[in-house]
Amino acid sequence: MGTSGGAVVIAISLQKGGVGKTTTAINLGAALGELGFRTLIVDLDPQGNASSGLGVHAPDDAPTIAEVLRREEALENIIEPTAEKNLFVAPAPTGQLLAEVEAQLVAEMFPQPRLKDAIDACRDDWDYILLDCPPTLGRLTVNAFMAADTILATVQCQYFALEGLRDLSEVVRQVRTALHPGLEIGHYLLTMSEGTKRLSTEVESELRTAFGDRVFKAVIPYNVKLAEAPSMEMSVLKHASTSKGAKAYRAVAKELSNGRSPKAR
């Protein structure tokens, strides 16, 4: 996966807030960084939680992903380092600017691969690029899907979890048909699991029956340290390195990389 040895680009998505999407972007990114992979998180969520959760606060006059999507700035020019090893962020703007950009994208008769073009210009600089999508399936998310090699769906262990997957699958089908042949949901990650509680085990069983080995073996538990880490502006790997949450994301990173080695630099 990835083109010509360039980064693997993964869109992290589900049409619902609070399912562990941004938590996964931050902590999977940090875990990949620990393994030596140079990793970029592109913050496409208007709330900007991936940026703030890693201590990245772009000044009001600094270019952000909004300017990249408007084709006013190169992606490589907006990237900020984080305190995490090998982990960088392309920050979201504050305020309503991304919502305004999405309105501009909606006005286009045919979706343009704005984010894909920006990523393709610098993807050889990275091992992984994680796209933290908005909790809606609008044009920002479609732009992310057009840029992605694959999609990682975060699935909370709760009732109606699979309903959100059906909506996501339909949008992926539409993008695949019209814009990006070959796009698929390549990975499913169970989040906020309460272990042996009946609801968690039922959702996990249903997901594994439906999607087989596309579901990560590792499951992200409900873990207070995971909830605390964003307020500390760091990953759970840095905030509580030996916690269950940190161990789970390290396991996911190892599954995802699957023996792949970081590029020599």
How should each PLM-predicted stretch be described?
Residues M1-R265:
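P-loop NTP-binding core
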